Amino acid sequence: MKLPLPLVAALLALGLGACNSNPNAPEKTPAAASGAPVALPVPDTKKRVLFFGNSITAGLGVEPEEAFPALIGQKIDSAKLNYEAINAGLSGETTAGGRSRVGWVLRQPVAVFVLELGGNDGLRGLPLTDTRQNLQGIIDTVRRRSPGAQIVLAGMQIPPNLGQAYAADFKKLYQEISDKNHVTLIPFLLVGVGGDPKLNQKDGIHPTPAGHRIVARTVWGVLQPLLH
């Protein structure tokens, strides 16, 4: 049977349209076409090193990449270690504030927890019994939320403005907590930096970028052996 030319043209157009219904659709790969398994992206399996502290950890007055936790992250990357550095510093944080927020920060498990708090307690002359209880509470929470996590306690010192006895007891507090809980201690986080005008900002408390580089070396000397 001979079809009219208009009908032939319509059928040809319909056939071509069906062949090209989605010209932008990607071509199927042989694996997809055959139903074979397709490789999925590998999830990030890096272990987390969490820095939990106040404005010194947060890097007040310097760029984020200049703060010592970021510098530790660079050292980790250079050493090709399977870890990532997380900065959970908060300016103005006291041990009481840290104790109240540590559970929220530990929603995901960590491999190493670096605890840098207490300086603001000491500068404000808060009771050392409270500081001790709060630091202990933070350590207890870490061990409950991330069993097996390595804990590093960063010791601090304060000037004797509030009396020699208070300053001495404040300094001893970190060693005592470290001994009681068998955690790794950095005796003084700001060794080589504290009290040096060239390495601190105008407030005399917060390190400059050069000061943070020294702090990072101090922390790395303690932290590196724990990363394996």
Task: Show where each model-derived region lies.
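Bacterial signal peptide processing site
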Residues: 20-23
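C-terminal motif of bacterial Sec signal peptides marking the signal peptidase cleavage site
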Residues: 15-18
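Alpha-helical cap/lid subdomain in secreted, periplasmic
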Residues: 97-228
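Serine-esterase "nucleophile elbow" of acetyl-processing enzymes
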Residues: 27-91, 99-109
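Active-site loop signature of alpha/beta-hydrolase-fold enzymes
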Residues: 58, 81, 88, 93, ...
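Bacterial N-terminal signal peptides that target proteins for export
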Residues: 1-8
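A generic secondary-structure micro-motif detector
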Residues: 5, 62, 91, 128, ...
